Amino acid sequence: MTTPSMQPQWAFMHIAGQDASQYLSPGVVQFAAATDTYFSLGNKFRNPTVAPTHDVTTDRSQRLTLRIVPVDREDSQYTYKTRFQLSVGDNRVLDMASTYFDIRGRLDRGPSFKPYSGTAYNSLAPRAAPNNLMFKTGADSKTMTIAQANIVGSTIDQDGLKINNVALNPNAGEPAVQEGLENWMEELQIGADKKFASRVLKADQPVLPNYGSYAYPTNINGTQTKDGTTVDKVYMCSKGANVQNPDVVLYSEEVNLQAPDTHLLDGPGADNPKDRVAFCAAPNRPNYIGFRDNFIGLMYYNSNGNQGVLAGQASQLNAVVDLQDRNTELSYQFLLDSLYDRSRYFSLWNQAIDSYDPRVRIIENDGVEDDITSFAFDLRGIGDLPYKQVQTHNGNQQSANTTDTCYIGKGNMAAMEINIPANLWLGFLYANVAQYMPDDFKVDPSNIQMPQDKTTYAYMNQRIAPAGLIETYVNVGGRWSVDFMDTVNPFNHHRNEGLKYRSQILGNGRFVDFHIQVPQKFFAIKSLLLLPGSYTYEWSFRKDVNMVLQSSLGNDLRADGARLEIHSVNLYASFFPMAHNTASTLEAMLRNETNDQTFLDYLSSATMMFPIPAGQTQVPVSIPARNWAAFRGWSFTRIKQQETPNIGSPYDPYFKYSGSIPFLDATFYLTHTFQRVSIMFDSSVSWPGNDRLLTPNEFEIKRHIDAEGLCVGQSNMTKDWFLVQMLSNYNIGYQGFYLPENNKDRTYSFVRNFEPLARQVVDDAAAANYRDVPLSKRFNNSGWRSAGPPIFAREGAPYPANWPYPLCGEAAWAAKTQRKFLVDRYMYRIPFSSNFMSMGALTDLGQNLLYANSAHSLEMTFNVDPMQEATFLYILFEVFDCVRIHQPHRGIIEAVYLRSPFSAGNATT
């Protein structure tokens, strides 16, 4: 064995090597073993060289990783293309599975980026409370002032307020708006001779509520006076006949007033501009923005115009053959799910799966636990009525040794009651559910100019959810999803923990200098062993912010000012750390045609989309005659056209959306909208036969009326369809029903995502006195909240509620049961036997034979729930998508793609 002294002294870190017992002298090894219990050496003498320990003469094979700089780059408006020269020397093997693109650039997430809820400025203020301000009012535009004077002094003269005969200095931060009387005792004993001062905004400043108001400092002392303007003193005296001298001085100034993260809920009307002082502010909606899960959309896949290249320089044959109907991104998502627990995040590859809060998608309205009353008390607790202590019970002569004023409260301590649990629950429902309802249900704020483009953040942010639809009393006691929100993308939400994580690892600012590592996902080369030779490797990267970035609200990031710049792309790779003779043996073996490297795309599907116009309920699908040998079945779901970009295009100008992209990242949520599907091979072939509960050639998925009791699991899914899904996912069915093993119950599996729902509603046919009162006429909590959305101020009078009708207790009304289900993150599956010759109708002699050698056409008909927007039927025809990579000689790489029964055409390069 080579001794340590003969080994080269590497100048870089290694992580493996010989154990100490392999190269230390026998005496030292024996001593270490004998004394290990009380003097442990551990790996103190580990040899710092990576395996193998001999027959390696170049440091390139020993390095943990190599950086490869591009030989050419092309930075265009929509793409950034790089070309690398891969040189694999003799007796070395490059591991393409270890490669990744190291990308540096600058990201502007745009003004719509807001990575938090609420406001960062004066968040404790009431929503309609004003700043200290002066404003013009009336026909003659006279000035009115509303202010809180917080600084106490002794005298007021032409120099303003004086404290201990020293006048306040506005340039030194005086009067300080953040200071004042320090405790309630000082407030009780101010004294009639005290004078007060504070700062106030001049009348030509914008009128904004204090909640959310901000002005940046213009002085090291924290003052905010605009440069080039002066601070003027405004004197105030009490409004009385005999009052002559002012007791308040206000220091008026102009500041750079802004509302960085709030907006007004209404605007000034022409009839009474004074009301604008009492306008209510609301926080801007949170909008996390980050790269997509696994950097989906950053690299071009399945795009003819931006096809990648891996070619040997000796032959120039490209090993990358991309198909329009192959879905590399979705395949990678499913592959990861089969390997890892996707609930674990891995920042290196930006792996943080999109999720949603189940409490938002499915509302378990348990009411509120408000058994204990919550009170709010005055800071001093007791009352503040002035009294004096007297000597006896008869007469008012002041007692000796007492002050002339005492403070006595009468009766119980004054208090205000607030139902904190009910307010928290109402706030949760409004912020997490009502804010995300479809735009058709929302209204514009009054007297506010709204943008015309409904895909922008400015429009989405200012739309207001109406009252009555999402309330604490709706479906109380039930577990039910809001019907009109079942078709709203639940992953476009600020409680998407994966997106929030991906946004936060970039930081909390709009402008980001990013440095990311992006893996190769294309199945033909992502695990390839590249043998000695010179190769050209190039790929294109998108710069379209709607494709590369993801936002909580799904707004059009292009229109909202987001920008992406790529400054550099380097390739990092590793050689297998093999001894030369081992590497040469491996190379000789792989050069042999019988040892070609064969890879299978994990999804192995031909993906097809069929448009479903708004309101349509039936979708026909026709597949021309072909040989169906090696066909595995169908997976299908439904996706919105608005959320589906044109992947074949370098830049889709009609894709004005940045939320989750279901057909790329597997955030499916419309799978529950299918009612039935029929499958016909030609006209004479009966498949899947009569071995099920329902009609041959047809799968009934759900029933709205179930007179025969064919539904299952307290939902309206049929037993037949439930059986098909259990069989296709877990091979569970013939042996009874049970939960699948943990290793089969993955993120995108059936049982994990099947959510049956049931509730009761008033049976209007059995209840003669039932009235379906319109939303505007329903009231509950009248007087204690706004008649409109709960974000406005309270109004009205206390009165018995008229909604909802009671469904339990002695006063329960006659009710009927409604059932449904959700099955998000899942594609329905229909399996198909690989032995197509035994798939016909079941008889006493077995199944009828179909002939694989003859071609059959396919007719499918899908019945779906109608939706108010255009969607796609998204089908995966599950086939075998394989590639065979052959490297017969140095610098030559050949690829043969095989796909049956949906051929890839001329897939040989």
Curated annotation (Swiss-Prot):
InterPro entries: Adenovirus_Pll_hexon_C, Adenovirus_Pll_hexon_N, Adenovirus_Pll_hexon_sub2, Adenovirus_Pll_hexon_sub3, ADV_hexon, VP_dsDNA_II. Gene3D superfamilies: Adenovirus Type 2 Hexon, domain 4, Hexon Major Viral Coat Protein, domain 2, Hexon Major Viral Coat Protein, domain 3. GO terms for cellular component: host cell; host cell nucleus; T=25 icosahedral viral capsid. The record marks 733 as: Involved in interaction with pre-protein VI. The keyword Phosphoprotein applies. All late proteins expressed from the major late promoter are produced by alternative splicing and alternative polyadenylation of the same gene giving rise to non-overlapping ORFs. A leader sequence is present in the N-terminus of all these mRNAs and is recognized by the viral shutoff protein to provide expression although conventional translation via ribosome scanning from the cap has been shut off in the host cell. Homotrimer. Interacts with the capsid vertex protein; this interaction binds the peripentonal hexons to the neighboring penton base. Interacts with the hexon-linking protein; this interaction tethers the hexons surrounding the penton to those situated in the central plate of the facet. Interacts with the hexon-interlacing protein; this interaction lashes the hexons together. Interacts with host dyneins DYNC1LI1 and DYNC1I2; this interaction might be involved in intracellular microtubule-dependent transport of incoming viral capsid. This is Hexon protein. It comes from Murine adenovirus A serotype 1 (MAdV-1). The lineage of its organism: Viruses, Varidnaviria, Bamfordvirae, Preplasmiviricota, Tectiliviricetes.
